[in-house]
Amino acid sequence: PAALIGVAEKGYMSVVLRLSATPGHSSMPPPKGTSAIAMLSAALKRLEDEQLPGGIRGVAAEMFDTLAPEMGGFSRVALSNLWLFGPLVQKQLEGAASTNALLRTTTALTIVNAGNKENVLPGRAEATVNFRLLPGDTKDGVLQHMRGQVSQAAPQDRFELFALPGAVEASKVAPTDSAQYRALNQTIREVFPDALVAPGLMVAGTDSIH
């Protein structure tokens, strides 16, 4: 078993993406890709496909550095030699939701709203996208990334972005060479002598960020 001491917590931001187009009737749809729903769909696909870059760095790197010597087989070899096996390990970690969240600011498409009648083309379509910010990334950086991706799918005068209230930056990373970390480390080892103790990243949101 492994016991992870949380040394940082990811940030939180939800952004509303709103697309506008000329409303109309479904009997005479506009040119391909120009309706509000079509542009929103293209923008969301781009945000899903072109997420913020990930990597084994920061808290994740420190966690694997700590755990690697205690592992066996190829896992020990790979995690102890990320300079060589880094791309392979990263691809493997990105394949699972729980470990992918350790490597990057995640993008989650959570709400979509558009239209209210089956034969009417709406003049507006919007979606909410939730981001969990990795330490080192910022709210402004995420908005810039999002704006850049959406502008590849829709004209800039057809969309707007705004962050919902309650957004918070990622926490600072607590040092692992502090007296507090050493005390927690020692206590955990005394209570759970078989556990591997390592620094960890809290990928969800808690009151601890305050």
Regions found by a protein language model. Name each.
Residues M13, A125-A127:
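Hydrophobic core residues within well-ordered beta-strands of beta-rich domains
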Residues A43, V142-S151:
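Short amphipathic alpha-helices in soluble, non-transmembrane regions
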Residues S27-L52:
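A short core secondary-structure module
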Residues P1-T34:
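Histidine/acidic-residue-rich, glycine-tolerant segments that coordinate divalent metal ions
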Residues P29-P30, D137-V142:
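Solvent-exposed, non-transmembrane alpha-helical starts
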Residues A8, P29-G33, N100, N116-G123:
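Short, solvent-exposed beta-strand/turn "edge" segments of beta-rich domains on protein surfaces
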Residues I56-N116, G123, D140-Q144, R158-H210:
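An extended, acidic, His-containing surface patch that forms the Zn2+-binding/catalytic region
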